[in-house]
Amino acid sequence: MLFNKDKNNIGGRSIESTGFAWWSGNARLINLSGKLLGAHVAHAGLIVFWTGAMTLFETSHFIPEKPLYEQGMILLPHLATLGWGVAPGGEIVNTYPYFATGVIHLVSSAVLGFGGIYHSIVGPDVLEDSFSFFGYDWRDKNKMTTILGIHLILLGIGAFLLVIKALFIGGIYDTWAPGGGDIRFITNPTLNPAIIFSYLLKSPFGGEGWIVGVNNMEDVIGGHIWIGVTCVIGGIWHILTRPFSWARRAFVWSGEAYLSYSLGALALMGQTAAEYAWYNNTVYPSEFYGPTAAEASQAQAFTFLVRDQRLGANIASTQGPTGLGKYLMRSPTGEVILGGETMRFWDLRAPWLEPLRSSNGLDLNKIKNDIQPWQERRAAEYMTHAPLGSLNSVGGVATEINSVNYVSPRSWLTTSHFFLGFFIFIGHLWHAGRARAAAAGFEKGINRENEPVLSMRPLD
């Protein structure tokens, strides 16, 4: 049966038939797999539509003379990071790939939108009777783990798509490429599990930075290979096996429980993305997203070091007002670092600064003889584009927020992902509590008999 026979009684529309009012959203469709499919497909269509429309909006407003991070872009930097339309140094030279990406997403959203409307209005209320493969029962533990397995395989394929792009299809932008960044093929991805999985065991503080501390594209692509393999193998495992008895006892098996698990995973992803957007300058290259806070502070110290060195200052021995080195000093571990208040960020790693290091920190000989013009230009640009706001000359502290002229994409992305992740985590707790209460057999939510909406005039 490809359609709903009774057009005047589409499932999930009334509180009498579902037990939920209209504002309860998809809760009305808990037992209507066909209509829930329509809601999910339509939701995917909305997401893809926003992506396509916003990509075209950013492309139409793009100014070649300005860096992306000065133009409030949040989608084009992602496409540039993938190596589309980029020249050495992160210069955007071709916007056609961005236009094509936007159009492809718009067309895809139309297909998804049609599918969502079809399954919401025309398609069968439930899939179990007509399409048993797509049908399900929330209590069917084996079916639920099969669906989990399918999702894991799709996630693995997504990870492999990035790997294929970096290894075979045009390469990927590497901010660490010599001379200030370039597109290159990742020919030797890191496959050593000791290296890849050691990131999970690193301290989240300082230069270690947990998984956010990754600072080379070989590890990034190697990590995606491991993620892809793990997800595909895990997906096949969950499709072919039944849940063990301990898993059957440990988990709550209901639609709301699965929702809570999903929200918990999304919250973790959102918080991790926020950390990446704020701290990492490898997968979020500063050429596209603007400098990190630490990078802007170091850039300021570096810029004034270059200026004063040209004016004859002895950068090796000059002391600042506190008696510490004005230009260079020692870190807590004995490395030579930039002086002044940048000591807060002494363990920063950035492509424009690393060529001046040796085994014991910054190399005085390199600083005196090897500083390149592109390093000076980049530091001068980053100095005035901190994600915190504009910097003054005191030493890297934001004293006056310059939000009228510049707000860093790092600020937008970090703040949005942090708060979305936080509130999604609250949703995880809420639905987990309701699911556990239902499984335990006691009352949850408000009393349906006295629900305010029952005394209100119907919307139609």
Swiss-Prot record:
Pfam families: PSII. GO terms for biological process: photosynthetic electron transport in photosystem II. InterPro entries: PS_antenna-like, PS_II_antenna-like_sf, PSII_PsbC, PSII_PsbC_sf. GO terms for molecular function: chlorophyll binding; electron transporter, transferring electrons within the cyclic electron transport pathway of photosynthesis activity; metal ion binding. The keyword Membrane applies. It is found in: Plastid, Chloroplast thylakoid membrane. Residues 1 form a propeptide. [CaMn4O5] cluster binds at E354. It is a multi-pass membrane protein. Binds multiple chlorophylls and provides some of the ligands for the Ca-4Mn-5O cluster of the oxygen-evolving complex. It may also provide a ligand for a Cl- that is required for oxygen evolution. PSII binds additional chlorophylls, carotenoids and specific lipids. Keywords: Chlorophyll, Chloroplast, Chromophore, Manganese, Membrane, Metal-binding, Photosynthesis, Photosystem II, Plastid, Thylakoid, Transmembrane, Transmembrane helix. SUPFAM superfamilies: Photosystem II antenna protein-like. The keyword Ribonucleoprotein does not apply. The chain crosses the membrane at residues 56-80, 121-142, 165-187, 242-262, 278-299, 434-458. GO terms for cellular component: chloroplast thylakoid membrane; photosystem II. PSII is composed of 1 copy each of membrane proteins PsbA, PsbB, PsbC, PsbD, PsbE, PsbF, PsbH, PsbI, PsbJ, PsbK, PsbL, PsbM, PsbT, PsbY, PsbZ, Psb30/Ycf12, at least 3 peripheral proteins of the oxygen-evolving complex and a large number of cofactors. It forms dimeric complexes. One of the components of the core complex of photosystem II (PSII). It binds chlorophyll and helps catalyze the primary light-induced photochemical processes of PSII. PSII is a light-driven water:plastoquinone oxidoreductase, using light energy to abstract electrons from H(2)O, generating O(2) and a proton gradient subsequently used for ATP formation. Belongs to the PsbB/PsbC family. PsbC subfamily. This is Photosystem II CP43 reaction center protein. It comes from Cyanidium caldarium. The lineage of its organism: Eukaryota, Rhodophyta, Bangiophyceae, Cyanidiales, Cyanidiaceae.
